[in-house]
Swiss-Prot record:
Residues 176-181 are annotated as: Interaction with DNA. Monomer. It comes from Mycoplasma genitalium (strain ATCC 33530 / DSM 19775 / NCTC 10195 / G37) (Mycoplasmoides genitalium). SUPFAM superfamilies: Prokaryotic type I DNA topoisomerase, Zinc beta-ribbon. Residues 3-127 form the Toprim domain. One of its GO terms (molecular function) is DNA binding. The gene is topA. This is DNA topoisomerase 1. Keywords: DNA-binding, Isomerase, Magnesium, Metal-binding, Repeat, Topoisomerase, Zinc, Zinc-finger.
Amino acid sequence: MIKNLVVIESPNKVKTLKQYLPSDEFEIVSTVGHIREMVYKNFGFDENTYTPIWEDWTKNKQKNPKQKHLLSKFEIIKSIKAKASDAQNIFLASDPDREGEAISWHVYDLLDQKDKAKCKRITFNEITKKAVVDALKQPRNIDLNWVESQFARQILDRMIGFRLSRLLNSYLQAKSAGRVQSVALRFLEEREKEIAKFVPRFWWTVDVLLNKENNQKVVCANKSIPLVLREINPELSASLKLDFEAAENVSGIDFLNEASATRFANQLTGEYEVYFIDEPKIYYSSPNPVYTTASLQKDAINKLGWSSKKVTMVAQRLYEGISVNGKQTALISYPRTDSIRISNQFQSECEKYIEKEFGSHYLADKNKLKRHKKDEKIIQDAHEGIHPTYITITPNDLKNGVKRDEFLLYRLIWIRTVASLMADAKTSRTIVRFINQKNKFYTSSKSLLFDGYQRLYEEIKPNTKDELYIDLSKLKIGDKFSFEKISVNEHKTNPPPRYTQASLIEELEKSNIGRPSTYNTMASVNLERGYANLVNRFFYITELGEKVNNELSKHFGNVINKEFTKKMEKSLDEIAENKVNYQEFLKQFWTNFKSDVKLAENSIQKVKKEKELVERDCPKCNQPLVYRYTKRGNEKFVGCSDFPKCKYSEFSNPKPKLTLETLDELCPECNNKLVKRRTKFNAKKTFIGCSNFPNCRFIKKDNAAEFKQ
């Protein structure tokens, strides 16, 4: 007899939870993710009731070929049902979001009626003993509003994704479209258009560098003193006929052509005299709040150089628990959240740590602490922001005890969390003004008065040597400095940058598109489909991606756009809050969407017949050549229109031949000639092997240790 059965979705959590729940009272089992899916037939829902149609679990006996070590869904469900029948209490403890709520509902729905009465739903935002024990003390019923919101999202994605994917596959040989992925693709295409139509503005500046010494007094220890031109002598400007701009929003003088800048620079001679020193101005820099999913993705991608997928994977490991000094420990709170809230208890623990390690003067002013505020955007399921589970476990404690990736991401999260509750940094900025032949210049000196939260970033912050510090105690009005260098420099405005994975996620979040659980796929799915490539971390849309976006925009512009997707996310939130009936919502959308699809099918079918001809014939069968796309969709090539009867093809970047040259030397095993070949996976590496491969697998001894056929 099992006293308490705890059902979770991830097998990786089992080991962590077992430390907190005594084995004689609790048994923990995992669903290994979603326990059942909608059927694929008819998009997986009933068109009369708009309810999901679930697959028959008794027939799902096939194992995932990539995870053969795991049980099939049939075996998992059968095991859970058997254990549930033998249990006194059943705690459904899947993740604290809508996906997790749906997983718990599926387990509940599959149980025998007598076992359903034993079920209670529990959630915890972090896997610590206190959080788990507290959750067991506060069980609740499954929130059917959350479940229905997840149903609606799943059906909506099927409605849009399946129908559009079929159209694209038949017309463009493109693999898929989707409610959110296609909006992300549209962002990429719109940015390409902005770049294409961008016209740069050119201007020139006259930049002066002064020697850092004045009468053998070094006033600037780390570098020369750079001056910014602020005002030109009117008489000089008139005599030289200078073309320049000194707009209010420009800090210096912009010359409109190089000739004017050069004429002015040639007039600058002699010494530069200090004529005024402004009163210092005090500036305060506040720390950022704790991480959300989107801000963690952005920072980890930018600072660690990771992909969005990697950030998600490592964060999940830290949440579920890893081995720390031989003990399984969950290190961070739930990593899928759009909240910046933290509990009062955790805040108190952090403040005690800060006071102990740095002193009470490093604590943030209570009146200035940024509290969690709800704006128009709904914070999904009232999670906390991402933070360490134990603030006393510092990054240094983990440095040599966990994987490098786990350490780096934990360090980002730990520093951001502690810094969010520390005092502002305080900086003084003083403007020093110089004059030369009635032309006025200035420079600014910065000095850090109190480091505050920035103290935590000393080890990982960028180099700040470029910041200018002038020892004002050694400087007075009337001091004169000689120039070290005067230069004329060209500048131009740059086009908007292409998106990186980080900036795309940031843009999608700003537009209220997607949810924390989907940010990873939103950034990566267009790469996987061949609609875009990453070059030096920037997205470049492919020709196929352009065609897909153009067709979707042409026929489904009312669906594949930012405002519609934002509206859909809001509707899903309203379903979760019991403000909207999910079946009525789906019915209204499906009725309108089907008519759009019908119109698009007629239009696309007409275009489909018009193949893109190359205007020459196949050299093998004399049929016309046409343009095609590779299976992945990211490479265009020339192929025969009579495919598959004729398989002739031409690639603009053909794969290098593996065989480089035939040698005079014979194979000692089969007497065929030896050849020099490239390795299959690295074209730069070569080896010598038998030309009779694969019948003969001889490799010359010098290479045998490195290459195996």
